[in-house]
Swiss-Prot record:
Its EC number is 3.1.21.10. SMART domains: SAP. Keywords: Endonuclease, Hydrolase, Magnesium, Metal-binding, Mitochondrion, Nuclease, Transit peptide. This is Cruciform cutting endonuclease 1, mitochondrial. It comes from Schizosaccharomyces pombe (strain 972 / ATCC 24843). It is found in: Mitochondrion. It catalyses: Endonucleolytic cleavage at a junction such as a reciprocal single-stranded crossover between two homologous DNA duplexes (Holliday junction). Mg(2+) binds at residues 46, 230. It is an enzyme of class 3 (hydrolase). Homodimer. It holds the Pfam family Ydc2-catalyt.
Length: 258
């Protein structure tokens, strides 16, 4: 184990979205044993009710991200996902919203992997904002639906999509490091600028012009561009992690034999 430095393994973990804490042997085993997921049909989600953002994308042979469908929707009114829901936050009504959303996303995109931005449970103030609780409720219901369906698929021996929870701080800080941005990634304008740089640098490509049109004309329609940026950063960052994990995992296997 002396032939590989701890700092090098920590750097690999940073490039692959893995935790950097632990001893050398722990990091090495983490890199080698972490699963590699398919990147052909990936759905990145920035969860919200009036600002539900999604980015459906894939990765080509050059590890570049190709966006197929990208938008942000207000689920309380007429929307592009055809969710029909009255703004009512009682558990029964939220369950109806969750089922509609769950079924629509699976039927519309048939994703192999779903990435959901992890919601916060603490706001740093004495009282938790009501909207935070509502979105947390939606998040929990979507997870419950997923694992119920996953259990059924296992019993029927059917392949079912993976659902992964991603820390927004991890994906945003990763892209801030890659793009060498000096602005704080916690600021919405900074994340919008990050996506703009990824598009201008052709690290993000588009299958069609519709998604790019929505992005370029965001100021003319009723959605916030920062929410749209977040789902793209989640999807593109995670797929880049996967490509690098595949590369470094094979490289690190040699050190396990020493």
């Amino acid at each position: 184990m002396a032939t590989v430095k701890l700092s090098f393994l920590q750097h690999i973990c940073k490039l692959t979205g893995l935790s950097r804490s632990g001893r050398k042997d722990e990091l090495l085993r983490r890199i080698v044993d972490s699963p590699i997921y398919p990147t052909s049909r990936v759905l990145g989600i920035d969860l919200g009710i009036k600002n539900f953002s999604y980015c459906f994308a894939s990765q080509n042979e050059d590890s570049k991200v190709i966006i197929h469908n990208w938008s942000v929707e207000n689920l309380t009114e007429k929307n592009g996902l055809d969710i029909q829901w009255t703004e009512d936050f009682q558990p029964s009504s939220m369950a109806d919203l969750s089922i509609q959303l769950f079924n629509t996303l699976h039927e519309k995109f048939n994703p192999h992997v779903i990435l959901m931005e992890r919601q916060r449970y603490r706001s740093g103030i004495a009282t938790i904002p009501e909207w935070t609780l509502r979105v947390n409720m939606l998040e929990s219901m979507l997870y419950a639906l997923h694992y119920a369906e996953k259990r059924n698929s296992i019993e029927q021996k059917i392949q079912y999509p993976f659902l992964l929870s991603l820390s927004p701080k991890s994906t945003y800080s990763y892209w801030a490091s890659v793009l060498n941005t000096k602005a704080s990634f916690s600021k919405k304008k900074s994340r919008v600028q990050m996506v703009k740089e990824l598009i201008d640098g052709q690290k993000i490509l588009f299958e069609n012009e519709e998604a790019l049109y929505k992005w370029n004309n965001g100021s003319r329609v009723e959605f916030k561009k920062d929410d749209m940026a977040d789902s793209a950063l989640i999807a593109s960052g995670w797929m880049r992690w996967q490509a690098q994990l595949k590369h470094y995992r094979n490289f690190c296997k040699q050190f396990l034999k020493q």
